[in-house]
Amino acid sequence: MKLTCMMIVAVLFLTAWTVVTAEPHSSNVLENLYLKAHHEMENPEASKLNTRDRCQRANFVCDAFHHAAVCCEGVCVLVCA
């Protein structure tokens, strides 16, 4: 019985904590994301999604620090293939 009461109190406390610490104006967060995306559509250079300029050519030597993310095509197995 005591364990059940403690569990109920813990759940109520965590629920209250979530409500108290919640973002008060969460709609503004979505609005800001929309405005940022709209700006990136008007100015493609501002977009962080255009990462093709950081791609490495084929036969680029890649190691533990330069992994498959830097190869434009294929995979990294000691060199970009």
UniProtKB/Swiss-Prot annotation:
* InterPro entries per UniProt: Conotoxin (IPR004214)
Tissues expressing the protein: Expressed by the venom duct.
Note the superkingdom of the native organism. Eukaryota
Q: Which Pfam families match?
A: Conotoxin
Q: Lyase: present as a keyword of the record? A: no
Q: Name one GO molecular function term.
A: ion channel inhibitor activity
Q: Which UniProt keywords apply?
A: Disulfide bond, Knottin, Neurotoxin, Secreted, Signal, Toxin
Q: Which residues form the propeptide?
A: 23-53
Tell me the disulfide pairings in this chain.
Answer: C55-C72, C62-C76, C71-C80
Q: Does the record bear Cell cycle in its keywords?
A: no
Q: Where is the signal peptide?
A: 1-22
Q: Where in the cell is it found?
A: Secreted
Which family does the UniProt entry place this protein in?
Answer: Belongs to the conotoxin O1 superfamily.
Question: What is said about the domains?
Answer: The presence of a 'disulfide through disulfide knot' structurally defines this protein as a knottin. The cysteine framework is VI/VII (C-C-CC-C-C).
Record's protein name: Conotoxin A11GB
